[in-house]
């Protein structure tokens, strides 16, 4: 679990739920550590302010390489907002300076000069993501989330649908597969415990 000055935003309820279902949280710093911790079975890149530390993140080439190699080997991973930004090829800050990031997502993330997304949303998960091999359910599975960012991506993902609860306005978002879930929304795990169980099951299979 990334935790330092650049990656510091996590809902406490989310961490409690991970631990409740048996996860052991191992902390590391994409800013200060040389590589990922040994013998981990999953990766959590939370929100924060990578744009304020983009130069230091770029300079830590060994960590960027460590994360890219781990995800290329299908280490189960969750990345939200700042963590999602870090996975891009590049990040361009508000001064227009472009920095190299982890290079996992072949896309650019850049400051837009205005608030891109703000507020609560419900994220509809891909059919069967958390229950592989089951019959189609009548109601799509959803998890509550929140977005607040001035940056945008040239590849926001199209595997989920985010919907505003009041207006009903919706848009595609998030890169999701059997081993990763990356996007701008900050998910609230207690709204869908099945999602947490799904991720932890993936980490167990990676042992």
What is each of the regions a protein language model found here?
Residues 1, 26-27, 44, 79, ...:
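Structured core elements
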Residues 4-7, 32-33, 49-51, 84-85, ...:
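Short, glycine-/Ser/Thr-/acidic-enriched flexible segments
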Residues 1, 15, 111-207:
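Amide-donor transfer/coupling interface in amidating biosynthetic enzymes
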Residues 11, 36, 95-98, 192-193:
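Alpha-helix N-cap/helix-start motif
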Residues 50-129:
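Cysteine-nucleophile active-site neighborhood
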Residues 6-59, 65-70:
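Phosphate-binding active sites in nucleotide-utilizing proteins
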Residues 21-23, 39-40, 73-74, 98-100, ...:
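Short coil/turn connectors at secondary-structure junctions
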